[in-house]
Curated annotation (Swiss-Prot):
Catalytic activity, as annotated: L-seryl-[protein] + ATP = O-phospho-L-seryl-[protein] + ADP + H(+); L-threonyl-[protein] + ATP = O-phospho-L-threonyl-[protein] + ADP + H(+)
Subunit architecture: Interacts with CERK1.
UniProt name for this protein: Receptor-like cytoplasmic kinase 176
Location of region: Disordered: 1-45, 359-395
GO molecular function: ATP binding; protein serine kinase activity; protein serine/threonine kinase activity
Keywords of the record: ATP-binding, Immunity, Innate immunity, Kinase, Nucleotide-binding, Plant defense, Serine/threonine-protein kinase, Transferase
Organism: Oryza sativa subsp. japonica
GO biological process terms held by the UniProt record: innate immune response
Length: 395
């Protein structure tokens, strides 16, 4: 749950035309629960939090006990929202328990000085409090008491996809090809569910730090603070202030403020490209001309003979070239400049299902040994270890 956000940047955009999202009934809505045909608008105050939300309203003292008084050594991560703490509660009663007993939780505590505010906290409660799906992180509860605003989630022991792709440490081994495709499929199913006719939600901030992994490396989407209800009736898009993260936001959304499900598809394409290449969406530590992953990779993606040049050297060649070409082609389609040329998420899921390996997937320890000699291989210089470049939020 240690999602990290960078500095927010104001951006207002003029309105022009935007491509309409694809329709159709989604099979991914069938194994999930949602309160109505569409999620109600984000409440403006805690008094408007829907009583139907299937989450617990915690007292602040309960969460203080569960996290051992928010001790520094229980911090899982920090971000624009605030800090995330590890805690323990009883699985049935949800009452705080002793460390190491009961259910592990992640408690996100709003920083009153932070740039992510109360409205995003409300949006998170509103969406995750009503939506239930295998590929969405579970919101256990929330706390609103005086000035305190907290969110309580299921604990995701493998952390974020971002850490596994970009953090260099013995704790994070290079992800195998099969495991990357498994994670991509899970995340795609989560987005397909959100875009379904039953839900009609645009995620708006799909990126590696918002894809969390459970013990089995199953992907779950987190952080719904920027989520938006999709267009209704005969409307083709939602007009909104430009928000999200540089490097992941679709070009037409940046230019017009028009938001569609195809905006999420573009963001997914960027993340898939990060998974294929082992490079960040934006990295100013790279050589000139390679700062923007999409711009750098697009020419290689357009040629099957050159696709191998973008593939992560840490994969150690342990993949089928035919499957790599298919995944690269899918990424290219998702990052199409024209939204109408992008597939919908159900189509993305269908392609990714073809790329799954029936064998057990997992991190390959041997890849870590090979990476030291191959990091300067097919996809260029060794990934930067100068620290994480800040992903700037668009607000």
């Amino acid at each position: 749950m240690g999602n990290c956000w960078g500095a927010k940047i104001s951006s207002e955009s003029p309105c022009r035309s935007a491509s309409s999202p694809s329709g159709g009934t989604s099979k991914y809505a069938s194994n999930s629960s949602v309160s109505a045909a569409s999620v109600p608008p984000t409440p403006r105050s805690e008094d408007e939090i829907l009583e139907a939300a299937n989450v617990k309203a915690f007292a602040f003292n309960e969460l203080r006990t569960a996290t051992r008084n928010f001790r520094p050594d229980s911090v899982l991560g920090e971000g624009g929202f605030g800090s995330v703490f590890k805690g323990w509660i009883d699985e049935k009663t949800l009452a705080p328990t002793k460390p190491g007993t009961g259910m592990v939780i992640a408690v996100k505590k709003l920083n009153q000085e932070g740039h992510q505010g109360h409205r995003e906290w409300l949006a998170e409660v509103n969406y995750l409090g009503q939506l239930s799906h295998p590929y969405l992180v579970r919101l256990v509860g929330y706390c609103v008491e005086d000035e305190q605003r907290l969110l309580v989630y299921e604990f995701m022991p493998r952390g974020s996809l971002e850490n596994h792709l970009f953090r260099r440490s013995t704790h994070f081994q290079p992800l195998s090809w099969n495991l990357r495709m498994k994670i991509a499929l899970g995340a795609a199913k989560g987005l397909a569910f959100l875009h379904s006719d039953k839900v009609k939600v645009i995620y708006r901030d799909f990126k590696t730090s918002n894809v969390l992994l459970d013990a089995n490396y199953d992907a779950k989407l987190s952080d719904f603070g920027l989520a938006k209800d999709g267009p209704t009736g005969d409307k083709s898009h939602v007009s909104t202030r430009v928000m999200g993260t540089y490097g992941y936001a679709a070009p037409e959304y940046l230019a017009t403020g028009h938001l569609t499900t195809k905006s999420d598809v573009y963001s997914f394409g960027v993340v898939l490209l990060e998974m294929l290449s082992g490079r960040r969406a934006l990295d100013k530590n790279r050589p000139t001309g390679e700062h923007n992953l999409v711009e750098w990779a697009r020419p290689y993606l357009m040629s099957k003979r050159r696709i191998f040049r973008i593939l992560d050297a840490r994969l150690g060649g342990q993949y089928s070239l035919a499957k790599a070409q298919k995944a690269a082609t899918l990424a290219l389609q998702c990052i199409s400049v024209e939204a109408k040329n992008r597939p919908n998420m159900e189509q993305v899921v269908a392609v990714l299902e073809q790329l799954q390996d029936s064998k057990e997937t997992g991190a390959n320890p041997q890849l870590q040994k090979k990476s030291s000699s191959k990091n300067a291989g097919s996809n260029g210089s060794k990934p930067s270890s100068k620290g994480k470049p800040a992903n700037a939020r668009l607000v």
